[in-house]
């Protein structure tokens, strides 16, 4: 069983626990999302005047801080870019990684979720979304490098950054990030069993 089929089997296994997982199954089943040779120049996100109070605000706050120190390992993560496409297609809306980070010789891909008072994606959804985005990167990194798909005016060093330095060498770490209220709701109120996420 190849990686794509393995992910699809996991997604189908968890689909009864979260009906929205069918959206992720649609992403990984879309052949246009793999190998599309279309040049892309992502627009620069607004980092100053942030009208949102939800996930975009959390994303900008982490990015604008430039560094995060993980409380458990004291590992320092630098955030050189955000909203990076992981696929190239004719469609104007493309799947993007929320945050791109670097820690020593590792690349960090972060998926963000935020809960205030409205409904939010479950941790099942967020973790599988992150896994599928990483899978898409493993299939598309050569073309993404070819077109230098990142934000040119961000702190990222365009002369040194290359997906090829990380993806084929398994030097990528996936991180799921959310605010406290999100985890209080999903884990604290036992909407899901945390052991189910291991």
Which residues fall in each region the model found?
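Charged, terminal alpha-helix-loop-beta segments
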Residues: 1-198
């Amino acid at each position: 069983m190849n990686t794509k089929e393995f992910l699809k089997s996991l997604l189908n296994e968890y689909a009864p626990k979260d009906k929205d997982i069918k959206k992720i199954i649609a992403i990984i089943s879309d052949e246009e999302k793999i190998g599309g040779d279309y040049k892309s120049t992502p627009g620069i996100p607004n980092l100053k005047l942030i009208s949102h109070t939800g996930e975009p605000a959390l994303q900008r706050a982490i990015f604008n801080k430039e560094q995060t120190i993980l409380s458990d390992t004291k590992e320092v993560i630098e955030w050189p870019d955000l909203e990076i496409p992981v696929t190239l297609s004719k469609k104007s809306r493309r799947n993007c990684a929320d945050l791109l980070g670097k820690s020593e010789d590792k690349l960090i891909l972060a998926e963000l979720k935020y809960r205030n008072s409205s409904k939010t994606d479950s941790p099942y959804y967020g973790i599988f979304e992150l896994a599928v985005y990483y899978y898409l990167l493993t299939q598309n990194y050569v073309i993404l490098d070819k077109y230098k798909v990142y934000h040119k005016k961000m702190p990222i060093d365009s002369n040194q950054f290359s997906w090829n330095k990380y993806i084929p060498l398994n030097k990528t770490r996936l991180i799921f990030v959310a605010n406290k209220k999100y985890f209080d709701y999903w884990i604290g109120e036992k909407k899901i069993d945390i052991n189910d996420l291991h």
